[in-house]
Amino acid sequence: MNRARILSRVLWRQGFSKKIDYARPCVTSLCTNSVNIRRQATVAVNDGYVKKFMKAVGWMDQERTRLKLTGYFLYECVPDSVSYDEWFEDLELPDTFASWFTITELHVWLLLVRYMAEDVTSSASEKKKYVKGDGHFVRNCIVEALWADVANRIKFLEGANPAIARKQVTELSEQFQAALVAYDEGLNEDKILAAAVWRRFYSLSEDVKAEHVAKIVHFIRHQLFMLDKIPSEKLRWKPEINWLSILKH
């Protein structure tokens, strides 16, 4: 009786002493189909995956960082290079912050038009279509730099009140969006463009000289022509913008 018990215990231990490793493929007789052992990791971490992850979280994306710097550089070339005094004097504009913003706004729009054109694709079988790309990204960076500069300048205005300053920025933002739409509509026709200039620069005043509006329209056409001549590669990494003088139009 004791021998039988000892024998049964030995057999029981031998049958269950081998533990099953559930992390490995099944090799027992219970597996009816063959199992192919994967030689690769469950999640393949390659350069493409890492790059996508970095883009998602906004880390270490060198190309986007360079493009953002391009956008900020492009904006800075407006207030640093445009001769505002010539615009004030030649076009009989008041030397005020509002006039400064209107002139800056126009030059920023010219940059936006050029960079948005970089995202327009066309082929022999398809019509032109717009696809958001680097041009759209740089455009947003230019606008971002504009508002950062505006907010900073308003703080230094004499007697500036923070609450009033925020309200002014909001109003300027609304005017900016309306101006962009109006200028865009005038791209293909001088009459519409002249109306947009008259409204934005002179508030539709009947006392304005027609030659002033015509001069601004001519400047816009000439400047767009010059911007269109800049190659795409230079536009991305080493943009050199030469702003034309309003006095030569």
Residue ranges and their predicted role:
Residues 1-54:
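N-terminal mitochondrial targeting presequence
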Residues 2, 247-249:
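C-terminal structured interaction module
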Residues 20, 42-46, 64-67, 169, ...:
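Intrinsic-disorder-associated interaction segments
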Residues 161-247:
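A charged, amphipathic interaction segment
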